[in-house]
Structures are given as C-alpha cells and as structure tokens.
Amino acid sequence: MVRKLIFLTAFSLLLTYGVEAAGKGFAIVVDQSTYTACKAEIDAYSTLLEREGFSPSLLSGEWKQPDELRQQLHHLYLHHQLEGAILIGQIPVPMIRDAQHLTSAFKMDQERFPKRDSSVPSDRFYDDFDLRFDDLGSDEEEPLLHYYSLRGDSPQYIQSDIYSGRLKPTRQGEEGYQQIRSYFRKLLLEREQQNPLDVVVAYTGEGSFSNSLTAWRNQGMMMREQIPAAFRNKSSAKFLFFNMYPYMKELVTEQLRRMDLDLMLFHEHGTPDRQYLTALPHTKESEEQMEAGRRLFRQALRRAGDVQQQEKLKQTWMELYRIDTLWFAGADDPKQRVADSLLDLQTGIVLDDVPLISPNARMVIFDACYNGDFREERYIAGEYIFADGKTLATFANSVNVLQDKSSTDLLGLLGLGFRIGEWAREINILESHIIGDPTFRFAGDVADQVDLRTTDTAYWLALYNKADHPDLKGLALHKLSDLGYPGMAEFLTKAYNESPYYSVRLQAFLLLQLYGGDHFAQLLEKSINDPYEFIRRKSVYAMGAIGSDHFIPYLVKIYLDNYLDERVHFNVTFTFDRMDFDAMEAEMKRQLDQNISYPDKEKVWEEFQHIFASRKRIAAMANDVTNREKPLKSRISAARMLRNNNYHKQV
C-alpha cells in the first residue's frame, strides 16, 4: 500500500497522490517543523494505520489560516473516502463566533468581552464540511488563533462528516517535540495489545448534578447496560463520590495509576488548569467548621489586595456575623498562606500534578468545563496524554459545558470495538474534542461487523431489531433519524415505550425532540416518571422549554414529591416562570393543601413563594425586548437572555 503525501504551504499547494489504495482514508495533519522533528514516530503511526486497513494521507505544511486545511480535508472526503484526521503540533485553531446556540451552555456577550474569551475553540470547522463561515481574521497576538463567524445561511446544527483528534503539545520547542515523540512511542506499544474495555472508574465531584445521590447512583445502572464486561468483580467498576472522604485527591490518584484502568470518567467543575474534585470537607466538629470559616475569610482578604479594602471587609464581616478580629488572624502570615495553599491543592488536580500522577487510564472523559481548552499553552486534557502513563486519548470540552448534558451517550460502542472517533462523531457538540489519537479503540469484534457508511435505512432498521446491545440499538436510531426514515417520530415513541433499557429510552427521548407534532409533548407525561433520573431531569427541562400550562400539575407534583432528587427538583424551579403565573401559584396551593407528607406546610409555601418571586423578577426582564422606553442596551440584553430562557408569552 502506498502512503499518500501532501505538502502545503501558504504560497503553494502541491498534491502528490500515490496509487489509489482501497480502504478508509485518514489524514495525518502536522506542521512542517513538528514533522521534521518527529518524522520517525509519525511515519511509524502511519504504518500502523495501514496495517489496520486505513489509507493514510500525510498533510505537512505551514498553514496561515484554517481554510486551506479545511479545503484539503474536504477534497479527501469527497474523493478518497476520508474517515478521520489527527491534527499534530501547531495546527491553526478555529475560534468560532455567533454560534453559541450550538454549545450546551456557553453564552458570553461577544461585544462586552474580549474576542479571545467570547469565541469557542472548535475543530468542528475541520470535521463538519456543511457548516459555513465568514473569515474574521487571525488574532494579532496569537496568530495560531483564527476567528470565524457562523453564517446565517449555514446549517444551524452539527453533523460531523469525519472525526478528528488534536495532538497539541503543552510545551514549546524541543520539549514539545519530545512530548509528541514519547506519545507516539507509548501509543504504538499500547496498540499492540488486545485490551478490552472492562475496567472503569467514574468520579463525581462536588457541585456536580446538585450533589444528587440519585443521579450518582443511576450512572452505575446505565453503565452496566453499556459496558457489562466491567461489572465482573468489585474492582472492575468503581463509582466514587466527592464526600466519601474529606479530600478525595489521593484516592482518585490511586485509581488513575491503576495499570489495568481502561476508562476514567470525571463529572466535575473545571478550568484549563484545574479539576475541582472537592471543596471544603463536610464535618460535624465545631472547631473544624470554625477553621473552615477562618480560612475562607483569609482567602477573601488576600484577594482584596490593598489594606484599606481589607479593613473595610473586616468591619463589614464583624458587624454582619458578630465576630472579632481573631477570625482574620494569619491572612498576611507567609507560613499561614503556604499552609492554606497546600490545603487548597488537596481539593483538586492542577496542571503540575498530572505528570507526577502519570495516569494509566487508556481513555479519560472530562465531563467538565474548559479542561480541553487547547487554545491555551497548557491544558488539563493535554497534560494527561503527554504524561508518562498509559493514557492515549481524552475527551474534553474547550469551553464551559452544561451539567445537564448526557456525557455517556452511546458509550457502550467503545466496549464493542468502535474507534473513539467513530463514537465521538455521533455525539459531537461544538465544544467537545478528542485530545489524542481518534483511531484508538479497545478490543472487540462487533464494530467490524457494522457498516457505518451505509445509507440503507433497511440495514439500520434490521440492526435495531436484531441487536442485543442497547447502544447498537441507539446507534441505529441515530442513523435512521439522520437518514430521514419515514414515520420516525412514531418509531421513536414506540422504541421509548417498549425498551427496557435506560440507554435506548434516553436516545429515543433525545431524538424525538427534533420532530414536530405532539409526540414529544405527550411522551413527557410518561418520561417525567422514568426510572432513569437523567430522563426525569431532562423531561422537567423540556416541559419548561415547551412552556405549556398543561404541564403545570406535573411540575408541581414533582416539586412537592421528588425533593430527594436534588437535580430534578432544582430544574423544576427554573420552569416556574415559563408558564402562567396565576395558574402555577394556584396549582401549587391546591396540591400542597392536599399533601399529607409535610408537617410544616407554611414553610414549604414560603420557600416556594421566595423562589417564585425570584423567577418572576427574571421573567420581567424579558419584557424589555419590546419596551421602546428602555435603552437599547437593556433591550439587547433582554433579547440575549432569551437564549437560555424560553419565555413564550413574552415572545
């Protein structure tokens, strides 16, 4: 098999193709300097792909803007069966603007905030060829960053044509080249192993899912359906919760270092440089509680800066909390500052921790904000793959991400031998990215029996009916939906009503939202009581998004009866202002009067009124959109608020 070689420069374009080879196309994209420094390792990777049935193309050059590269990838897709690409080294970073509706949560004012901060680093620019953009130019200080605006005549949804992965080093110069060389060496060693996906660890950090134990417990039930091989003994599937121990960092580190660990899944808050595992430990000891309070005061005083501001804060706190100056002692003491800093480091994993941990999980999923922000020189997801352990790929987000987003959709495909990229292509959002080799896969022979390229709806219908694994059924539902199978809304409704699997019902639920008619609204009356907490959570959210007063009795009942499902209960409060205020209040009073579970109904009513009043104040802001007496700035702000708040009556 002859490898295809493509050299690109800013001034010339030279395409040199070898004899056309059968098989799936794959593009190895690398800047010229990196290829020169890492040629042996990159060529060895290409040879590995050839052995696995790919027809790899090497694209090496010095790109000034992403458009040149996108055109070449599109050409390979149209004419050479391109399936995926890996972007190695200093490859231009598309910074997408005017596409926040394609993100799960990112909503930042593009006029008020700097362009760099209010754009989304996204390789959907490279792997979804139907999206259309206007070129806004490169960043003046960081020319690797290139800004694009999503056009109004572009598709307003994501449906990636190929899959992609990034291999951007977290060090500069020779150190960065060494990272890439070392990565490919360990990748080649691991790819020689036939390693099944049968050891999984999931960690839920403080603040995730409103600290709901129900949500935490249900993820184990879901993953047992998806990855049954991991549930063979007490150590092969572990689900850790932030309050199992005062500081969980050491326990998490131990799990990451396990030589047999295949998949690590983090549900946590994050930044480019940190994973937040825990906050202040919960304790019943009064002295520990007081010390935690003193530490918070010290941290706030240090952030305040000048002495005058510190004294002002102290006076405010002493009057408000009736405390003395002893609560602030040590704020300026260097030894106390170091002690507080060391304690703070116990609450999370920072950039410099990762090389010391040397994580061995072959794949790590970060269900977190910003851990995959590859516009930064160093970022958590990158540090994981370049550490000395066995981690080969991470799946992470380049900006903030919605907590109420399913992070394990179709995850069972990985255990069946599908490549990480094949899985990610089905579930991509604007901010999600593979960091590392997208062709990596765990051992399994089912994937080779599934033709992902076919557009024959009869094939996918047969797969849905015959498949034993629930995520194969879920994949079939996705393909049938993408291909426009007639009567899909009815088919999805039937799939939800008949399937015993959490994962199949979830995919049917999520896909049914894309169709008009009454099918989805009618399904919500049943799905709001689904055994799977995440479906209940999303059902509540969907009722609020639809905004029909018909749902008021259902939402009130959930609010009063499901207070132990913290995240579901939390989502209900965000629906109070989406429907008729008087009807919502009257129904709450009616059901509360009939409720026999609450010993103090007056307190429950007061809590509802407090939340209800707050939501009504927020809803009132939406009226500014049409109020010509308001300043233009206020009206624009109100219009932006509608992106996350579906106020149908005001619109």
Residue ranges and their predicted role:
Residues 6-16:
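Bacterial N-terminal signal peptides
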Residues 407-494, 502-507:
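Caspase-like cysteine protease fold
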Residues 454-464, 485-497, 517-528, 548-560, ...:
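Amphipathic alpha-helical scaffolding segments comprising HEAT/armadillo-like alpha-solenoid repeats
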Residues 468-469, 500-501, 531-532, 563-565, ...:
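Short inter-helical turns and helix N-cap capping residues of alpha-solenoid HEAT/ARM repeat scaffolds
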